[in-house]
Every structure is written in C-alpha cells, then in structure tokens.
Amino acid sequence: ERNDAARLRDGGYDAQWNDDFHNVLHVLLTGETSAYYTDFADRPAERLARCLAEGFIYQGEGSANHDGTPRGTPSAHLSPTRFVSFLQNHDQIGNRALGERLTVLTDPAKLRAATAVLLLAPQIPLLFMGDTDGSETPFLFFTDFHDDLADAVREGRRKEFAKFDAFADPQARARIPDPNARSTFEASRPEPGPDAATWRALYRDLITLRMTHIVPHLAGAMAIGAEATGDAAVTARW
C-alpha cells in the first residue's frame, strides 16, 4: 500500500507484493470502482501499462482514496523481478464482504487473459489456493474470537463496508457473514470449480511457457516500455 521502493534497495528486501497490479486488473476485470479502487478507475489500461513497465502505479501521486495524500516513491529503476504480482490473495478476497473470487466476478475469457499476463510477465507471480482449479467457493474473513472481541470484530467489519456502494444500506451489511461463525470457516474451503480441468490445463501450459521462454532471460531484466493500445489493452516490452 505504501509503495516504498526504498525497501527494495540492495541489502533490503528481494521483492514485495505489488497491490497496484491487483487493483488495476481488478478494475479492468470487474468494473468495480468503489473505495480503494477509485485510485484505479480512471484510465486503467494506462495505469496497467505503467505497472508492467515501472512496478508501482503510484510513485508519489495523490491518492483519491486518501484525500489526495501522495502515495508511493519512484520505482521505474527497479527490475521487474523486484515485484510480486497476483490476481487474488487471502487479503484481497478475504477482505471482500462476501469473499467472492474472480471466477464469479468476471467472465472466463477476461480471467484467462489476466492469468496469461500474470504468468508470462517477468514479475514474480503469486497464485492463491484454488486458482488453478477455477474454484468458485468464497474465501471469507473468519476468526476464532470470543465475547467482546468477537462482537467488536463482527460490527467493525460491517461498518467498514459502509463506504462501498453495494453495502451502503444497513440491510445489505447485515448479510455479511459473521467472522466468528463456524459456518463462515467451513464455507471457505476451496473446492474445484466446474471447469477445473480446463483451468488446470491453462495453468500448466502457461507455467511451461514461463519456465521455457521467460525464466532463462530474467537475470538483469528491465522494461523497455509499455503503453495502452485500447480501453482494456496494453503492449509491454522488456
């Protein structure tokens, strides 16, 4: 979230998660632009191009989600292998009110294209459990708290979603599963989706391509450039 490139200098961390990659692709895949996605709602293809070429999208620009406060530091000088990219992870799914995966939020063709970007770009790809099986089961926010803490977490979570358009109505927020209920945990077990074999084959093919044609050239890799070529299309070169 801070997009602090200083942590990736020599002697620091080898790589860090890049939430900007997830956020801009989520906007392109789902059309959602509420809350922190507002920072990526405008010209998302251009923002994705910057992400692929330079790492962070926000490199000191003001964040609409944070009332214009500047976010991030310059990162274009860093190798793409300093960034960990992902379409889903436990935070981004689990922090959704209903824990939906991209398999139920967008159409398969778009998700296949995004998966190809994830696995064939030089950044380090991160996969979340259930991705390779096309799982459609939710991954909900669940805890094992009790008494006052359990009540505070339950109500605090519902208040948190008041800023999302879909949960502005208190009745809608009442549908958010109780994090402390056993049923919330049980519902979060990943199960193979109806097209699991197709998704496994796609991942197998893309990972093979990555190992054969991408990984041997990652040492010293740097971006040459990237640009948007349409409302949801990007050309990138490394």
Predicted regions, residues:
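Conserved alpha/beta catalytic core and glycan-binding cleft of carbohydrate-active enzymes
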Residues: 1-170, 182
